């Protein structure tokens, strides 16, 4: 069976970058993504599950069989909801119109990435424009044995760490 898909957008918005292709092509062991994603999401989220699946299919296609994923609907069973929450995937509230009434429902839109005994998660997939970067960053972090170090000098009028929260948060995530 031949898999092919054409991305006719000028920016190649629906294609993996060469860096992401090389990253999964060089996986030397099984890498699993568990995508906890509610099946029937209301607008504006209703296409996100399909678009995420397409992106994960691309990763798998370039991985020589080492990249696998599971697309799981946690709302189907309470034990699956609990599993998602154990992995750090919280439920989010979404607005749904049913019977001409606006209601709030619980939904899941998160990923857990597993490699060996290590794991990372993306708690809520909010912006699919950045999902390739987020997934590839997590893959690189999980598969890399190199731990970079950073040093900050102070005392020369630089802002204190408390004042540069964004940098601190970014470093914590790394």
Segments (PLM) and residue ranges:
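Short, surface-exposed patches at the edges or C-terminal ends of soluble domains, predominantly
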Residues: 1-174
């Amino acid at each position: 069976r031949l898999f092919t898909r054409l991305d006719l957008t000028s920016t190649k918005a629906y294609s993996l970058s060469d860096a992401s292709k090389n990253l999964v092509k060089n996986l030397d062991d099984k890498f699993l993504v568990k995508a906890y994603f509610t099946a029937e999401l209301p607008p504006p989220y209703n296409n996100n599950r399909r678009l995420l699946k397409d992106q994960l299919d691309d990763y798998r296609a370039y991985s020589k069989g080492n990249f696998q994923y599971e697309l799981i609907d946690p709302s189907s069973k309470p034990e699956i909801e609990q599993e998602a929450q154990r992995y750090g995937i919280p439920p989010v509230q979404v607005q749904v119109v049913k019977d001409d009434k606006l209601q709030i429902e619980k939904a899941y839109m998160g990923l857990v990435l597993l490699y060996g005994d290590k794991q990372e998660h993306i708690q809520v997939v909010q912006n699919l424009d950045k999902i390739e970067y987020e997934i590839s960053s997590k893959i690189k972090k999980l598969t890399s044995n190199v731990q970079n170090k950073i040093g900050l000098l102070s005392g020369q009028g630089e802002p204190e760490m408390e004042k540069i929260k964004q940098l601190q948060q970014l470093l914590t995530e790394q």
